[in-house]
Amino acid sequence: MASGKVEKMASIDAQLRLLAPKKVSEDDKLVEYDALLLDRFLDILESLHGSGIRETVQELYEHAAEYERTHDTKKLEELGNLITSLDAGDSIVIAKSFSQMLNLANLAEEVQLAYRRRIKKTKKGDFADESSAITESDFEETLRRLVDLKKSPEEIFATLKNQTVDLVLTAHPTQSVRRSLLQKHGRIRDCLSQLYAKDISPDDKQELDEALQRAIQAAFRTDEIRRVQPTPQDEMRMGMSYFHETIWKGVPKFLRRVDTALKNIGINERVPYNVPLIQFSSWMGGDRDGNPRVTPEVTRDVVLLARMMAANMYFTQITDLMFELSMWRCNDEVRARAQELHSQSKSDAKHYIEFWKQIPLSEPYRVILGDVRDKLYNTREHAHKLLANGSSDVPEESTFTHIDQFLEPLELCYKSLCASGDQPIADGSLLDFMRQVSTFGLSLVKLDIRQESDRHTEVMDAITTHLGIGSYRSWSEEKRQEWLLSELRGKRPLFGSDLPMSYEVADAIGTFRVLAELPNDSFGAYIISMATAPSDVLAVELLQRECGIKKPLRVVPLFEKLADLQSAAASMTRLFSIDWYKNRINGTQEVMIGYSDSGKDAGRLSAAWQLYKVQEQLIQVAKEYGVKLTMFHGRGGTVGRGGGPTHLALLSQPPDTIHGSLRVTIQGEVIEQSFGEEHLCFRTLERYTAATLEHGIDPPTSPKPEWRALMDEMAVITTKEYRSVVLQEPRFVEYFRSATPELEYGRMNIGSRPAKRKPGGGIETLRAIPWIFSWTQTRFHLPVWLGCGAAFKHVIEKDIKNLAMLKDMYNQWSFFRVTIDLLEMVFAKGDPGIAALYDKLLVKDELKPFGENLRKSYLEAQKFLLEIAGHKDPLDADPYLKQILRLRDPYTTTLNVFQVYTLKRIRDPSFHVTVRPHLSKEMDANSLAADLVKLNPTSEYPPGLEDTLILTMKGIAAGMQNTG
């Protein structure tokens, strides 16, 4: 390495060490990883754009790092002066550079997280962030802990065999990084991991370093900005890419680890292959709530695409299995089946690469698997032709139409191998394959359908109006129930082709007809958002029957807003008391609770407590009626939308509310963090399985009555304070839209769904995602903390003994600890100084006191929270996360300053800036700017501003790791 390069590298390392001077564990290599990636990136930047750009990037970084050390707001203004003097081309290059550096920092963290040993001495329960997952047990530790609690291995195994975790990948991919970049990020992560492996040869190291530089340059040269809004089909393909990359192979690998962990506590038996500990569902192409782009045709497309992908993934594996199972010894059943298939096989299969000639009877397993291969090939072709042409000439009898048809020959081979003394062989690739079949079926994922209750009301209103019996919409709840039940008990058809239909009604009915047409095993639940009453559920049951769905989907009400959560138990009581409905559900019911809209409606603390209570109430109602209830947690990736670390968030749920059956959303913005890399995928599967098992066998204790009373009191104050600002202050919407990039959010083309449920209107019409996203961008996180400070202050000033009680709650009650620690993590990521800069530049003078008061509330809430947690500064008890944030902050701060000054220039054309000479080393000073303008020829703003703004949004989202 040349001396100049050594000096640059040492300089970068020194700067990072100023921010994070101490290692947090023996195996802490985060600063080394960061320094290597940053050094390679800056070298690439210099080679592409010259030393002037590199020096400016480093100068901006140093100003931002100085601000992070001193919090002197003059440094922000100095940053602003440097940034506004850049010309359009340089501005985009430098904003893109900081966004890239944040992505690289995240990749360094993922590598560190995937490989570091656990820090044993960290204080128990410090679980502020997913990435601090020190207290998140691996599966083997969970089993050992349960055995230490005097739970027998047999009890643990029996409980495990009866549990299922269904992970639901959501349709609105708030994942703001393009798939093209995610793949390049994967290569960077792999190279970095291998570079630090033991016993790496000098040649390997050099080649890996070159590969790393190629991947970094390829990522930097890829346009970060989606120029076209993704369709629901695009979203689905992106979600499914994780199955290709990690999940497909990750599931059998994880289940094998479960077997090993069980063996280590004395269970000499494997988890049965047909026990699906993990299942996967999706909303991609099924979630039509507020998204007019999800049509019946889209739903049909994504179902057929998923079936084609599933058949293809099985097909690509079956040849390896045929190579492995070359044995001749078998039982009589396998021999007879092989002879039968052999006699039916007429000709060679020239479209196969391996085993294309007729397989001899001396290889019976291969004969049987050859028939499985033929059917998989035909299954794939059948789905492909239906998808491409709308029809298929592949005979259905030559395909797999049901999972039992697929599993049966595999089971036959498995049992024969075991009976022939070859169980070790049976428990190899064949067992892995059977576990994949049990987990993924023929559909890869089960598609949930989600629609808002009002759309079903429109359909029913069209029907009753056409029948001449009045307007369903104007009927009371009692009259609606009476009519729906009379129709459900009867058999007459409700409507025919002469039913007058609006576009919305036709779309809703078209969805039910697609459900009737497609294979039933492709679908999961039919979820009704904004559910408020039993008639919402009965209407969907009736529409399923009317449209000819032979095996109706289970109907799941989703309770979201505070008032709906409060009345959820009463609604389910009324439903369970209806004989027709009780017979229909056959003793099982699923209810979904929404974290996003409840938080937007009432504030995070109130929503969290109401969600806790509603689960207790619903479980009690279900017990009274002899119904097994599954809770479906609609958690967002961000704290404002119910996000947080998996293991402890689940363990903080009320006792008896999981019961071995759990559904939970994996939101778009955390899919990459959960499944983007092999080790991350493994940890995700491990966390959910371990937490569900632990909650079932060793449930958390219930809160004391006095704790409940205090929470009730604080929830009332929180909601009152939150709503007094967000919903009742007449100029709040004006302030919100001035002080955040909410108005510009739609330009990001993040997902296929509109940002609003309805055009116009205030905060109540805004979806929870852009609401959270906008405040995350300004580092103010208002929806998470607003109201908390007022609640803490009220109860402590009312009686100082309440402070001691709050401290007891924090130390003894997992729900309260999780809630407080998540708040603390948000305060660690927040910065009221940055938020003040947005106000200074973007908000009218008469609205500025609004922001000043909110920042006082922020600091007050933080003060009380730290007092309750017994910490001097945020994250005192979590050095690992504190280190991560310190290393990340200078990048994020630079992007914040970029963003606020760009917003100022967009919104205020009279804002004057003096542009200095072009820095980038292009042949022509205007060529880079011209090229970048060509990427966005329709922008209504001066050259470079719109792209710079979007790049800052993406970068800050990467820095916060909560895009909304």
Swiss-Prot record:
Leading EC class: lyase
Metabolic or biological pathway, per its Swiss-Prot or TrEMBL entry: Photosynthesis; C4 acid pathway
This protein's GO CC annotations: apoplast; chloroplast; cytosol
Cofactor: Mg(2+)
Any Pfam family: PEPcase
Modified residues annotated as Phosphoserine in this record: S11
Keywords attached to this entry: Allosteric enzyme, Carbon dioxide fixation, Cytoplasm, Lyase, Magnesium, Phosphoprotein, Photosynthesis
Coiled-coil intervals, chain numbering: none
E.C. designation(s): 4.1.1.31
Family note: Belongs to the PEPCase type 1 family.
Protein name as annotated: Phosphoenolpyruvate carboxylase
Organism encoding this protein: Amaranthus hypochondriacus
